[in-house]
Amino acid sequence: MTSVRKRKMNRSSVGKATRRNKDKQRKINIQSNPIIAANWDYSLTMAQNYKKLGLRAKLQTPAGGKEADLSKVVKRIPLTKPVLDEDEDEDEGEDEQNDYNAATVELDENEIPEGGARIQRDKNGDVVRVVYGKKKNFDADEDVNEIKARDTTEETEVVKKLEELASRPVIRKERSQSEREEEWLEKLYKKHGDDYKKMFFDKKLNIYQQSEGDLKRRLLRWKKRNGIASK
């Protein structure tokens, strides 16, 4: 026999706390756009799908970190070299020669950002000269089309289809008045004529308090359809 508390719980309108299925909760059913729905991969996350389709999940810069691209192999060089090889002296000699060759390379001031500088040293570590950068972050004289062409990435097929869909001409369908609306406008016209102010203050016919401008637009459309000349 159940207790009084259990019987009250069974009669209560508050639903029981049941276990939710996370897979059903997270599943996305795309119905808004057929192009995106056809190319959506449900095994990927939303951000991964947007990146695959050539779209952006967020218009602004992401506040947090980005997902690591595992397709690119980044080789990490240790800061300190372990002393394991017998040919350490030869390696050090090669490193010094490489450093000297790098130091003798001419630095281009047009490749260094404006406001920054590069120090050029000799093989002994002494400063030879300081090269100040002249490369501007944004050139006002540069053509806008060149900037756009440089910044834009290659469009995917999904983006091209979406642009074609968005560029189609939209056929505007004019709103038609219903029979009840025409009967209501006819009553207003027979009672008040072209006096839209009296129509506005008519509490029996104008129960939804339509404004004078709205009543005028509706009546002009109704007159045009019924062939009534406007005064």
From Swiss-Prot:
Region of interest called Disordered, as start-end residue ranges on this chain: 1-30, 77-120
GO cellular component: nucleolus; nucleus; preribosome, large subunit precursor
This protein's UniProt keywords: Nucleus, Phosphoprotein, Ribonucleoprotein, Ribosome biogenesis, rRNA processing
Keyword rRNA processing (UniProt): yes
Annotated compartments: Nucleus, Nucleolus
Miscellaneous comment text of the record: Present with 2860 molecules/cell in log phase SD medium.
Role description: Involved in the biogenesis of the 60S ribosomal subunit.
Family: Belongs to the NOP16 family.
Name of protein: Nucleolar protein 16
Organism: Saccharomyces cerevisiae (strain ATCC 204508 / S288c) (Baker's yeast)
